[in-house]
């Protein structure tokens, strides 16, 4: 829970289904909320659906208003990244969101059961930048698609192998 005490960077929690990624992310969010940090936790496909509703003339909030809210919340927890349908619009919105938060140095927690190879390159580079992101591999998950994740350049650049849950 050290991350929750002072969330400043990004945390990527990766693992197969059923390993506790969402539960851990929710615990981080609840702790941060309890100490007064503004938190938004949303499942990636639900976020995209929520944003699409902003285009409806019957919605009281515009797309821009909804997107700004997600982009600027102090701590964003994006659950199950990679489970959304990959469309050009969805890919672009997710990149815009992550890129904005990356450039603004806003703390972000992302959970995924996708491996690096299945992610769009520009999203992957934001999630795995060793300058701002730490990775927690749940249950020996092989995020990099290699036999030993500690041999990747990401692990070496942080000076330690990825943490395992």
Predicted regions and their residues:
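Short loop/turn elements that form and flank the Walker-type P-loop nucleotide-binding site
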Residues: 6-7, 35, 70-73, 101-105
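Residue-level preference for the first positions of well-ordered beta-strands
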Residues: 8-12, 38-39, 75, 107-109
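Walker A/P-loop nucleotide-binding motif
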Residues: 7-25
């Amino acid at each position: 829970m050290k991350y929750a005490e002072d969330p400043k960077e990004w945390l990527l929690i990766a693992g197969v289904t059923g390993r506790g990624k969402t539960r851990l992310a929710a615990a981080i969010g609840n702790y941060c909320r309890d100490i007064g940090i503004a938190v938004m936790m949303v499942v990636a496909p639900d976020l995209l659906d929520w944003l699409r509703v902003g285009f409806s003339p019957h919605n009281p909030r515009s797309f821009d208003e909804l997107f700004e809210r997600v982009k600027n919340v102090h701590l964003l927890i994006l659950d199950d990244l990679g489970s959304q349908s990959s469309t050009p619009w969805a890919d672009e919105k997710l990149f815009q969101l992550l890129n904005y938060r990356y450039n603004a140095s806003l703390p972000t927690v992302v959970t995924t059961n996708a491996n690096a190879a299945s992610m769009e390159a520009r999203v992957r580079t934001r999630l795995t930048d060793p300058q701002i992101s730490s990775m927690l591999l749940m249950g020996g998950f092989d995020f990099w698609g290699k036999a030993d994740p500690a041999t990747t350049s990401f692990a070496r650049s942080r000076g330690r192998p990825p943490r395992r849950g």
